[in-house]
């Protein structure tokens, strides 16, 4: 069973676009493929729909190496950004599992409004849940410290507004010592987010 280790976090210390991408392709992407295939198999019956694995290729980059990399699970075979999707990704200091709304997904105003009207779904999430309002930076906020009303209103009303919610596993977490526990924590994160996902796709 493949799982993230110190080696994968160290990939973001490799200098140069081609050099870092070579490490990402060789070390990180096979982990994404294996874990996401497993998560898709586990989540599909709960959702009643097939999920497809998408792995970021960073093809638009010509000079600067990526500071993070990610994969996505989506019912759309061709792409994922235009609709709610699950992400598994890694920065230099943590791995993230998000329910993600980026790049102006379809019906984002309706999704944001539905979330504003159903905030009890957020209250049901575990305390170690985090929120990201910009997928291009590593700064995230614990859900209990997030002004949810403000964050969701921004997601609804600002063209570049984004919203990602889920959990992380820090680089120094003890979970990495037990790959099966780490994988179970990741899967549980996605399962806890299913009510929000289902509300979003119903819009």
UniProtKB/Swiss-Prot annotation:
Gene3D superfamilies xref list: Protein of unknown function DUF1054
SUPFAM superfamilies assigned to the protein according to its UniProt record, in alphabetical order: YktB/PF0168-like (SSF142913)
Source superkingdom: Bacteria
Secretion signal, residue range per the UniProt entry: none
UniProt cross-references to Pfam families, sorted A to Z: DUF1054
Family affiliation: Belongs to the UPF0637 family.
Record protein name field: UPF0637 protein EF_3078
Source organism: Enterococcus faecalis (strain ATCC 700802 / V583)
């Amino acid at each position: 069973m493949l799982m993230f280790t110190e080696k994968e976090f160290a990939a973001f210390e490799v200098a140069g676009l081609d050099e870092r991408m070579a490490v990402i392709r060789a070390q990180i992407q096979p982990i994404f493929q294996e874990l996401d295939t497993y998560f898709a198999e586990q989540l599909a019956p709960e959702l009643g729909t097939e999920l497809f694995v998408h792995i970021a290729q960073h093809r638009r980059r010509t000079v600067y190496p990526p500071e993070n990399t990610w994969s996505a699970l989506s019912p759309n075979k061709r792409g994922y950004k235009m609709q709610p999707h699950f992400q598994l990704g890694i920065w230099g200091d943590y791995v993230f599992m998000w329910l993600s709304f980026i790049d102006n997904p379809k019906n984002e105003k309706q999704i944001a409004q539905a979330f504003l009207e159903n905030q009890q779904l957020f209250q049901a999430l575990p305390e170690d849940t985090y929120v990201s309002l910009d997928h291009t930076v590593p700064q995230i906020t614990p859900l209990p410290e997030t002004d949810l009303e403000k964050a969701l209103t921004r997601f609804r009303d600002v063209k570049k507004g984004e919203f990602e919610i889920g959990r992380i596993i820090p680089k120094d977490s003890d979970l990495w010592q037990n790959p099966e526990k780490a994988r179970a924590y990741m899967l549980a994160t996605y399962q806890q987010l299913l009510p929000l996902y289902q509300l979003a796709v119903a819009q």
